[in-house]
């Protein structure tokens, strides 16, 4: 039987960033091959650093998918754990070591007997940086294994062990990276009339773009436009010719995301025109679409967990954080949910360390749900 804690600790020590998960893939394949030995209803495919494990059903009517992400983050770990990261500047600070371990535990249970319906276990790379789910889908990695329904989870530090939270609508926002560069004309601070100050134009943009959320977004829906980087100039007495802004757009529906993206671009171009200068606007959403749960499937999952002993189900509000599972859920109906891990430190914090007792709880809960779906 798979030692969940040992497995998690082994994975925790080898975090790798997206599309570089070579050791992680090798470790996972070793475990998967041991678990599936002698199971003639199992097939395994790899795609770059990703893995697909397909359990052929005995009387299949559909394919049920379970997705887990496998990449780490470019963070220096500060947990002080004896099994801390062995990769300098890399850490499983988003709980993907837990996600992988739970998926392996569920795979082990699913292999106890051939399911009626097909089951697909997806070990997906590059959730954090390259939208690996989109890359796999667009490259045809699923082939005829593409699920009819897709499920997945994400650990959440501010929920207690035993708590599962989701809803029947949007769980994660869609995110879009924004880069804007204003191009004016440099000059000496003493002669502003001979220059065209990009810093001033960019400053006007930062204040004016706030009107997008306050005046273009339905307040019931909500959206976020935040610029965390503003770079302009090198010294106090020189007017800069360029100003660079780097920010993010967050929205709970794709339609709203596209509206906000359009308005941000329009405001930037309007400011540039008013100051008689050029502007470059780069909007990069890629595969980070809103994670929109299928209402009927979400209600089914919530009802199932609500009746499970040891599980406290929470109907939770959406989060403005992003998750690339949204892309796959835009192609296949499915559900994502939060799993409580009770950590005082947030996701992506260098001291984030979940409680390991959640591993057994997660495996028991998810495997029982997948068993139900596979038998329908």
UniProtKB/Swiss-Prot annotation:
For this protein, what is the EC number? Answer: 3.5.1.47
Organism of derivation: Streptococcus pneumoniae (strain CGSP14)
Locate the active site: 69, 128
Entry-linked InterPro entries: AcetylDAP_deacetylase, Amidohydrolase, Bact_exopeptidase_dim_dom, Peptidase_M20, Peptidase_M20_dimer
Q: In which pathway does it act?
A: Amino-acid biosynthesis; L-lysine biosynthesis via DAP pathway; LL-2,6-diaminopimelate from (S)-tetrahydrodipicolinate (acetylase route): step 3/3
Q: What does this protein do?
A: Catalyzes the conversion of N-acetyl-diaminopimelate to diaminopimelate and acetate.
**UniProt keywords, alphabetically:** Amino-acid biosynthesis, Diaminopimelate biosynthesis, Hydrolase, Lysine biosynthesis
Q: Is this entry keyworded Nucleotidyltransferase? A: no
Q: What is the protein name stated in its UniProt record? A: N-acetyldiaminopimelate deacetylase
